[in-house]
Amino acid sequence: MASGKFITFEGIDGAGKTTHLQWFCERLQAKLAAGGRQVVVTREPGGTQLGEKLREILLNQPMDLETEALLMFAARREHLALVIEPALARGDWVVSDRFTDATFAYQGGGRGLPRDKLETLERWVQGGFQPDLTVLFDVAPQVASERRGAVRMPDKFESESDAFFSRTRGEYLRRAEEAPHRFAIVDATQSIPEIRQQLERVLAAL
């Protein structure tokens, strides 16, 4: 199928993943340049014209739990069809700020939506497709909360309680335990230079 690679960055809000995403992608691009491959940087929800409109709704409007999950997967189907799959088919590498693990963590772990419902949607939308690598930025909810409080006005998810993020983090770690071959866990409690040292090791292994 695809000759490119698909990498995702995951973690609870405030873990710092977005802070390091551009840095990581610049170094990955330098590594791939000799082979003529490009790094496509994208995000979920979002990444397409429709996806960005759905992102605005999902992050700011209250809604039924199942509606939220369905919209997440609708945006994902569009993202796969228009961005991810074509890029991989060209031989490019794709790095996405969140993917399906986030839905299991947030809508499943955080919101409590039954896992079997999410698995049904996952099979329908993406079949057996999974990231080649998921970089999970792991941090305690209390630390993440302090970081979120230091930035802009929070969206709907960023405003959730520490208890919500504790459940979300727990689901992320459970998924990492189930698929250790796919996950690289970054200790996101460390300083920016220390986190980048961890990411350098991830890059070296690619």
From Swiss-Prot:
Pfam family, one: Thymidylate_kin
Reactions mediated catalytically: dTMP + ATP = dTDP + ADP
Gene Ontology biological process terms from the UniProt entry: dTDP biosynthetic process; dTTP biosynthetic process; dUDP biosynthetic process
Residues given in the record as ATP binding sites: G11, I12, D13, G14, A15, G16, K17, T18
One GO CC term on file: cytosol
Presence of keyword ATP-binding: yes
GO molecular function: ATP binding; dTMP kinase activity
Domain of life assignment: Bacteria
Keyword Transport applies: no
Enzyme class: transferase
InterPro entries according to UniProt: P-loop_NTPase (IPR027417), Thymidylate_kin-like_dom (IPR039430), Thymidylate_kinase (IPR018094)
Swiss-Prot/TrEMBL keywords: ATP-binding, Kinase, Nucleotide biosynthesis, Nucleotide-binding, Transferase
EC code: 2.7.4.9
Entries under PANTHER family matching the protein: THYMIDYLATE KINASE, UMP-CMP KINASE 2, MITOCHONDRIAL
Protein family: Belongs to the thymidylate kinase family.
Function: Phosphorylation of dTMP to form dTDP in both de novo and salvage pathways of dTTP synthesis.
Name of the protein in its database record: Thymidylate kinase
Native source organism of the sequence: Burkholderia ambifaria (strain MC40-6)
Organism lineage string: Bacteria, Pseudomonadati, Pseudomonadota, Betaproteobacteria, Burkholderiales
